Amino acid sequence: MFDGYDSCSEDTSSSSSSEESEEEVAPLPSNLPIIKNNGQVYTYPDGKSGMATCEMCGMVGVRDAFYSKTKRFCSVSCSRSYSSNSKKASILARLQGKPPTKKAKVLQKQPLVAKLAAYAQYQATLQNQAKTKAAVSMEGFSWGNYINSNSFIAAPVTCFKHAPMGTCWGDISENVRVEVPNTDCSLPTKVFWIAGIVKLAGYNALLRYEGFENDSGLDFWCNICGSDIHPVGWCAASGKPLVPPRTIQHKYTNWKAFLVKRLTGAKTLPPDFSQKVSESMQYPFKPCMRVEVVDKRHLCRTRVAVVESVIGGRLRLVYEESEDRTDDFWCHMHSPLIHHIGWSRSIGHRFKRSDITKKQDGHFDTPPHLFAKVKEVDQSGEWFKEGMKLEAIDPLNLSTICVATIRKVLADGFLMIGIDGSEAADGSDWFCYHATSPSIFPVGFCEINMIELTPPRGYTKLPFKWFDYLRETGSIAAPVKLFNKDVPNHGFRVGMKLEAVDLMEPRLICVATVTRIIHRLLRIHFDGWEEEYDQWVDCESPDLYPVGWCQLTGYQLQPPASQSSRENQSASSKQKKKAKSQQYKGHKKMTTLQLKEELLDGEDYNFLQGASDQESNGSANFYIKQEP
């Protein structure tokens, strides 16, 4: 147990030969703080120096781990408490006929019997907590166990720019050293030790205490953004004791020499890491703010809703007319489904007026600048027109990309899209997409990228051919150049694990896997469920999160469905899905499209095969190329 370097000028030549043979620390990224043995960080325990007893609280520990040069106290607090009572202690010692010594307990804040009783109670509490945790881990879901047992990999935090620390994760990687609580210890107080990152999985890190080398027996998972994870040097600055794990406490005779060698030149967290975590979890949206959000029962319109709660940037919105406040809708604050008050009127979008004539007390309109900005577009030249055909993700069945039609052109680049063959007569299931939305595609996108295209319901001329369909319906394809072709260097790869919102039940966040990558489009599979529940999602969707996000924010994570739960829940889930979809979508059939330099609306198209099922790097023109 120790607080900090007393002095690095101390002679460390007494280190054992086993310590001298320790392997060198592997090189690490350059922009993390370097731990220096300059005498300003730590004091290390020296097994040769024997044991000591704190003169304030009576705790026994390694002498060199004690506070101050005289090694009379186990911590700063004991030293300060003793100082205020030193005169009283001195008088008491003289009356007893014994001068105070470094190993003698001079003053107790409470009787020894009471301390022993408290310590026994503390040990019993620890045992009960251990049993409780074991029971929970057996019955609950553990990302660490799930990843270890299956050798999974997780998407890095840098893939999620909207998530906490997504833009300032830096070079946190394997071999970075941190200070963490030492759970392999029988002391009644909370103590710490240094550990290195063995593996990263999102926010979660597999840690190994220094001194265990290749022994993984006490490896443990924790959230790197948690309150108990600190950069090396934090204990010294905070007056917290560092104690080697009990399992290896006799492994080295000179812990100072060992740690100096292991830590010199190694990397640790930035000193302001916890501050950055805290700042990245501050959200501008607050309860009682009013917004316009899509009406989940009539997708073609918006309604006024009030922010009920904010969790990790996700908003629970309650529709303003809901008397019992149970008619709600979940989405992220950067979702394209929410807008400032007055947005619908400004672009010509349908809007359901509220029966409430005036704002309720405490409710106020959300400032417009808090909402996600859309890319500005020029509608003065060639632009989308009503009746043009395209391909679009069905908002009511996100596992499918369907034949679709532009039903209405709104202001500021917004479009109302209808799914061919399954539209409601009143257009209540039209959906608003921006022209730059990554959820709409030019004609032929699915064929080029070998994605199943869902033809219009009731269309019998199969296999579906766009050329024939356009001719039969007297329609034209939306010009390719009007679609968004940007492909960010997102970093996702097939097989990566993450936490994803079930957009058909947006209050649920589930264990999920990336199963396909088509440029910026990701196929998300919910672990334990059939493929029919998969969803197509953009790589920059605010509904995707790193492993450990739910734990970090306190949101409930839905674990993979077991075989029994799938059988029990499948029927009800499908019923919910069909009810929510409003319209029957027809059987899904694999269609092979045959577009081979045919004329679509009198224009020649050459097809460019886009890279798929791999990590995208940089932008690429992957759509059909329209020749001038």
From Swiss-Prot:
Under SUPFAM superfamilies, the record lists: Tudor/PWWP/MBT
* Substitution effect: residue 236 to G: Impaired interaction with EPC1. Abolished interaction with EPC1
Q: Which UniProt keywords apply?
A: Acetylation, Chromatin regulator, Chromosomal rearrangement, Chromosome, Metal-binding, Nucleus, Repeat, Transcription, Transcription regulation, Zinc, Zinc-finger
**Is the keyword Coiled coil assigned to this protein?**
no
Q: What is its main location?
A: nucleus
Q: What is this protein called?
A: MBT domain-containing protein 1
Q: List the source organism.
A: Homo sapiens (Human)
Cite the residue spans of the region called Disordered: 1-31, 560-590, 606-628
* Gene from which this protein is expressed: MBTD1
